[in-house]
């Protein structure tokens, strides 16, 4: 393979050169390049807000670039829509999947281009062509199944198969493993490598460094809307990539934890929730100033614990004591009044109001407290508290009236956490808080957790990333099939021990 810096134009399948894009008051892209070869897997990396999404929207015609050129298979192009891009051989598998849940798998595969026999859809041909593609990609899904019955990983396979059916030459994958098990990730990687072997150029977007090194051949790094480098991945270290992404050296991935947890703040005994299957006889305690991790495989019911504590799920048996006093949270409002806060797993669907501004998203959990004596909202206090969230959480935004949906994932998450801090919680529960967030934003969230622990807050974090749990927590509660398999001291345990416990009740 030719060296990237001296490669000839014929070596490239896709060339995006000197791309500029500005919005009012913001230079989103400044002379950015992305060049992808056939038969390669190309990592596109950068912090949230670095310009990755804007660059790809320029490729797909969602945004019109201000200047620069896009050459695909030797021809300069300017797609008017993602549909046109797909028809020409450029496809994207989004983090938020784009499937019609109540239709069959094969309906989704051929939506808008059904094979016909006379005036009718040729169901037999549609089935056979779908099955042939699935067989070639080693996808074990019945084309006649409803999409709603499938797992997230199976839905992603359908999106990839759809790109395959269009004979896509460029396939862009945005955080494709964020909700997958290790087994599902390995299967996905097998399919990606098959696409590579057919001559596709894969653009792979992920914040998971281990995946990048395992899968990719080359890397392009963006920072603050500017192109930093495009080079072979071979020979680069994780620290070098992080340094280029954030513009500084991160000497450590996790902040130092020097404080010692204090007295017990929360006691949970024999907790069982109503919905089945769910948690059974869960017992643990949480200390002031402690960060308690919850680990477990997919289906272990980790989320059920925090949802039951927060009043989203109803408990059947068991006791919850706060400062030694029995409490029952029958609703989220009751939980908030008792000093609980929950940052949910699905940021876009249950965490933010995507089409509303930062101010609304910052204040919604505490909105009743902003009424003055006349029953009207106190706009001065609301503006002040929104600004506190922006400043304290270091949210990158033009202002408090900015639509939160336009922010990067990391900045959205900071707003959500800031929203809950305004309720002055004693117990902060975070469910996969760094999923889909870049390394710089992750470190800021870890710092925040550490600072809150120093202020005697009790913190519970659910995470599927083992290095994260081992790096930030004091103890780890391991769940297996709805039951507590063990509680371990983080400093005394290993990843293998946690995985052994997580498999105990399967």
Swiss-Prot record:
Its record classes its membrane topology as: Peripheral membrane protein
Annotated GO MF terms: ATP binding; ATP hydrolysis activity
Where is this chain primarily localised?
A: membrane
Catalytic activity as recorded in UniProt: D-galactose(out) + ATP + H2O = D-galactose(in) + ADP + phosphate + H(+); methyl beta-D-galactoside(out) + ATP + H2O = methyl beta-D-galactoside(in) + ADP + phosphate + H(+)
Question: According to its UniProt record, where is this protein located?
Answer: Cell inner membrane
What GO terms fall under cellular component here? plasma membrane
What InterPro entries does this protein map onto?
AAA+_ATPase, ABC_carbohydrate_import_ATPase, ABC_transporter-like_ATP-bd, ABC_transporter-like_CS, P-loop_NTPase
Listed A to Z, the keywords are: ATP-binding, Cell inner membrane, Cell membrane, Membrane, Nucleotide-binding, Repeat, Sugar transport, Translocase, Transport
Which SMART domains does the entry mention?
A: AAA
Q: Which domain of life is it from?
A: Bacteria
Q: Which residue intervals define the domain ABC transporter in the entry?
A: 14-249, 264-506
Instruction: Describe its assembly.
Output: The complex is composed of one ATP-binding protein (MglA), two transmembrane proteins (MglC) and a solute-binding protein (MglB).
Q: What does this protein do?
A: Part of the ABC transporter complex MglABC involved in galactose/methyl galactoside import. Responsible for energy coupling to the transport system.
**UniProt xrefs under NCBIfam families:** PRK10982.1 (NF008215)
Q: What name appears for this protein in its UniProt entry?
A: Galactose/methyl galactoside import ATP-binding protein MglA
Lineage of source species: Bacteria, Pseudomonadati, Pseudomonadota, Gammaproteobacteria, Enterobacterales
Per the record, the gene is mglA
């Amino acid at each position: 393979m030719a060296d990237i810096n001296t490669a000839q134009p014929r070596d490239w399948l896709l060339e995006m050169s000197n791309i500029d894009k500005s919005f009012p008051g913001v230079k989103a892209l400044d002379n950015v390049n992305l060049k992808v070869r056939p038969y390669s897997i190309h990592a596109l990396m950068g912090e949230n807000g670095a310009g990755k999404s804007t660059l790809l929207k320029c490729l797909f015609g969602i945004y019109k670039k201000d200047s620069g050129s896009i050459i695909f298979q030797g021809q300069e192009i300017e797609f008017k829509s993602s549909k046109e891009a797909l028809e020409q051989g450029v496809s994207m598998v989004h983090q938020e999947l784009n499937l019609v849940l109540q239709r069959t798998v094969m309906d989704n595969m051929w939506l808008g281009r059904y094979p016909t026999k006379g005036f009718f859809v040729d169901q037999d041909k549609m089935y056979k062509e779908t099955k042939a593609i699935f067989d070639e990609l080693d996808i074990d899904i019945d084309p006649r199944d409803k999409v709603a019955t499938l797992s997230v990983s199976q839905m992603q396979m359908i999106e990839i198969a759809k790109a395959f059916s269009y004979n896509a030459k460029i396939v862009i994958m945005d955080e494709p493993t964020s909700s997958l098990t290790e087994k599902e990730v390995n299967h996905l990687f097998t399919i990606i490598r098959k696409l590579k072997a057919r001559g596709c150029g894969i653009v792979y977007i992920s914040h998971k460094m281990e995946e990048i090194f395992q899968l990719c051949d080359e890397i392009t790094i963006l920072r603050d809307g500017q192109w930093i480098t495009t080079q072979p991945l071979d020979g680069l270290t994780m620290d070098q990539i992080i340094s280029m992404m954030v513009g500084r050296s991160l000497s450590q991935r996790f902040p130092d934890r020097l404080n010692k947890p204090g007295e017990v703040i929360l006691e949970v005994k024999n907790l069982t929730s109503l919905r089945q299957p769910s948690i059974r006889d869960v017992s643990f305690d949480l200390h002031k100033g402690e960060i308690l991790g919850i680990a477990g495989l997919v289906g272990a019911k980790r989320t059920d614990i925090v949802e039951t504590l927060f009043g989203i799920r109803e408990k059947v048996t068991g006791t919850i004591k706060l400062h030694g006093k029995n409490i029952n949270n029958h609703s989220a409002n009751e939980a908030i009044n008792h000093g609980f806060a929950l940052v949910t797993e699905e940021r876009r669907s249950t965490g933010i109001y995507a089409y509303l501004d930062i101010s609304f998203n910052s204040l919604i959990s505490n909105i009743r407290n902003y009424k003055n004596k006349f029953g009207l909202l106190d706009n001065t206090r609301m503006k002040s508290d929104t600004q506190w969230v922006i400043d304290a959480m270091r949210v990158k935004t033009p202002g408090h009236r900015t639509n939160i949906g336009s922010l990067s994932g990391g900045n959205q998450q900071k707003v959500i956490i800031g929203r809950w801090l305004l309720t002055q919680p004693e117990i902060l529960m975070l469910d996969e808080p760094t999923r889909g967030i870049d390394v710089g934003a992750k470190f800021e969230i870890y710092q925040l957790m550490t600072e809150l622990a120093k202020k005697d807050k009790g913190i519970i974090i659910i995470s599927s990333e083992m290095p994260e749990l081992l790096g930030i927590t004091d103890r780890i509660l391991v769940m297996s099939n709805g039951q507590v398999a063990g509680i371990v001291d983080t400093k005394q345990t290993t990843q293998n021990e946690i995985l052994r416990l997580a498999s105990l009740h399967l």
